[in-house]
Amino acid sequence: MNNSGSALKDILVLGAGQLGMAVLRALAPRARTSALSVTALVSPDTINDPSVQDRAKLAELRALGIDVMGFDLASDEHALTELFRNYKTVLNCSGFVAGPGTQMKITRAVLAANVARYFPWQFGVDYDVVGRNSGHPVFDEQYDVRQLLRSQLSTEWVIVSTGMFTSFLFEPAFDVVDLERGTLHGLGSWDTKVTVTIPRTLAG
């Protein structure tokens, strides 16, 4: 448990993208009923130099009663730890946009901050089934996140495995379906089955 002397805020949601917005829309009315505070973390550019789409998103979040904070997840681990110290629960909807190593860095910072409850970015693939040495470094990192969480007892953690998001199959970073080259890569082996879902189903 975080022992900070100041009053802790309730819930910090990392990311307001495809999944983050679906989660925030579902979470806001429930949090309001329970008098819980919700903060959405977005990139600084979303606030400082918003696109038309960003402006609409920010307006929706504020209408939902959600506080919005600009913060770069590419920041160093210490900065992340200091941020997370202010919250009881961190819900990670950041995805892989910040690059390799980010999910491990976020997880280490959550643990260092003694956050009471953490929902890691583990939506979709069951990384225990895929295992390590899957051929996809992003998946290997996610497996390592699980091992790190299991190695400690201070922070409660919850994994929500629902099936991979359909759109991610076609993301270049995942290297599963490459439409330009007309290639398809198996996850670990051709015997690995894939279940897909959409974010609004997960958050509903």
Task: State where each predicted segment sits.
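Oxidoreductase cofactor-interface core, primarily capturing Rossmann-like NAD(P)-dependent enzymes
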Residues: 2-37, 41-43, 47-53, 125-204
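Structural motif
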Residues: 10, 88-89, 117
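A cross-domain feature marking catalytic cores of carbohydrate-active enzymes
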Residues: 42, 94, 122
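Conserved internal alpha-helix in NAD(P)-dependent oxidoreductase domains
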Residues: 113-116, 140
